[in-house]
Amino acid sequence: MSAISVLSHDDFVAQISSKYTDVIGAKLGGKIISFSDEWFAEANNLIQPGLPIRQVGKFTPAGAWYDGWETRRHNPEPADWVIIKLGVASATIIGTEIDTAFFNGNHAPAISVEGTFVADDKDLDSAKWEEIIPKTECGPSQRHFFARDALTEAPYTHVRLKQYPDGGIARFRLYGKPTAVFPADLNTEIDLAHVSSGGIAVAFSDQHFGAVDNLLIPGRGKDMGDGWETKRSREPGHVDWVIVKLGAPGYVDRVIVDTANFMGNYPQSITVHAINSPDADPAHDDPNWKLVVDRTKTGPHKIHEYIRADAASGSPDADETQKVLTSANDEVFTHAKLTIIPDGGVKRFRVFGRRASA
């Protein structure tokens, strides 16, 4: 069994959440499959994006309203539980955040996390569960950060959170590495930056209003809240940036910068660079970054597409198409950097290409 460490928030960010993906989040497609009880508050709240909130004095027919999962008192079983299907095909797991915000006197005294791999939800009844995080104490109204010393050996499709014996948990985050399912043909174009391909944002300048990991999730979202948005800059020459480690080294054929829902706060312009840095994540000012998309203006609520110079046409869904530099045609890259000038919001960042090797 892997050793488990209790980390501070800063250490968890540095070691876990900045390097791995929350593979159960609702915005990624995580889904509650079943639960033992949700008398006071729904289990679905566990995987919602954003920090939990409190509305003092708000009641439902079941009792006080809580932004989390809360079960009834006096559970006759050892633990209450909830089963969650990952938002990716499968993933290995490295750590978890358990947030008991606003649950004080009714919080979960202890938790554990288990995982299983099944081909279909109907196989869960006979599934074999493996321990990921052992039974660990929790305190009231606080964020708890637990990390393994290594990724699990096997990937999982579903996880089971237990609370002993009952109570409330506001949010549940589970970090790991998606197990990408790549096409056998290396010439097949895929989104190398997509979270399901293993893409992850490893560094950024700012994420004041919206998190950088939103750039890599499926779909075009629903509002400005599920994109990346930085605070307003006041200094001349200011830019914001994000570095994405691609899920696999590859050749860049097409880039998309989507400003969906950003109407008065989209970037004035953008650039895209790429680099081959297989041994370490590069610094944003590394001199080896190569220009892939030259500085171009962006517009509100648009899909901006940039394609190889020798490509016949781009995506039919694109609102605006440019050409990428030919330097991207035959070079292998491991990371891409999106720079927004001077600041603003972007919904999605796609880096389509071909893997360099199997």
What feature does the model see in each segment?
Residues K85-A89, E130-G168, V239-W241, L246, ...:
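Beta-sandwich interaction modules
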Residues G247-P249, A260-S269, D279-W289, P300:
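Beta-sheet repeat architectures centered on beta-propellers
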Residues Q55-R73, W81-K85, D125-Q142, G219, ...:
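Acidic/polar, low-complexity linker and loop regions
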Residues M1-E77, I94, A101-F117, D123-D125, ...:
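Juxtadomain low-complexity/linker regions and immediately adjacent membrane-anchoring helices
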